[in-house]
Amino acid sequence: MFTKTFGCVRFIYNKMLGDRLDYYKETGKKLKNTPAQYKEEFPWLREVDSLALTNAQMNLNKAYSNFWSNKKHFGKPRFKSKKTGHASYSTNNQHGSVRIEENKVKLPKIGWVKLCLHRPLMENSIIKTVTISKTPSGKYYISILVEYENQILLIIPKKFLGLDFAMHGLYAVSYTHLRAHET
């Protein structure tokens, strides 16, 4: 199923890029298309996670915005090749669609997958995005983006000191009476 999702994400990216280039050549305007528009023509796109396809659209939009903001640095968006051997896709956690239990991770449209977690997740962390990658050697990796609040440690002071400064040259300290201000 990973291979199918990688292929569909690459296909939708390339199809949207090709359609956008053709439309721009014909009209000189930007085509605003979505992955959902292609599901009628290509019903096999329904078999994979829709958020993975939406993230492919967002990656294409980001590539175009980078290109238009700095043409010298970024260059024109290019078609994705299946021959590189590297493939990846990202999906978002919607209403608990991605979760980790014991040594397994649940992914949308795929189900439970064995996982070797390299470091534990923080308590009360919320999974935001998961990126699944395949290297040219055939190894799979999952990168998990989480959000959590830093817990501020409450420091309880042992002594309290109160100061009160008066403009006429005296100050009051909580453990004694009045003192003259020394300059």
Locate each region found by the language model.
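Nucleic-acid substrate recognition interfaces
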Residues: 1-179
